[in-house]
C-alpha cells in the first residue's frame, strides 16, 4: 500500500554554487555521496542537484517535510546496475519507521538546467 508520494524539482544552477562551499556540502551530503558527485567532473552540479531533490522528495513523501531530519541521514546510492536508491540513517530512518514505511521507490532525472526526483513510500 502506498503511504506517501513526493516529488521535487531543483534548478541545477542553485546547487552548482554549492560546489565551492565544502562546509555547506558536508552539512547536507554524506561522504559517499560527495565522493560520487565530485567524481563526475562536468556532471557534478546535476548529480548534486538530483540528490538534493531526492532528499526533498523524501520529506514530501513522509507528509511531514524534513523538520527534525538531518539531510545527511538521507543518502542516494546506486546498486550494481546503477539504479539509484535511498539509504536512510538516524533521524530519517526513524521518521520512516514512524510512518510505517517498509520500502522506498526512487526515480531520478536531470538535464543541464533542472533535476527532479520522485519518492514513493510503501507500507
UniProtKB/Swiss-Prot annotation:
Pfam families: ACPS (PF01648)
Catalytic reaction annotation: apo-[ACP] + CoA = holo-[ACP] + adenosine 3',5'-bisphosphate + H(+)
Residues that, per the record, bind Mg(2+): 8, 56
Cellular component terms per the entry's GO annotation: cytoplasm
Signal peptide: none
UniProt EC number: 2.7.8.7
Chief place of localization: cytoplasm
Compartments in which it is found: Cytoplasm
GO molecular function: holo-[acyl-carrier-protein] synthase activity; magnesium ion binding
Superkingdom of the organism of origin: Bacteria
Keywords tagged on the record: Cytoplasm, Fatty acid biosynthesis, Fatty acid metabolism, Lipid biosynthesis, Lipid metabolism, Magnesium, Metal-binding, Transferase
Cofactor (UniProt): Mg(2+)
Family recorded in the similarity comment: Belongs to the P-Pant transferase superfamily. AcpS family.
Biological function: Transfers the 4'-phosphopantetheine moiety from coenzyme A to a Ser of acyl-carrier-protein.
Protein name as catalogued: Holo-[acyl-carrier-protein] synthase
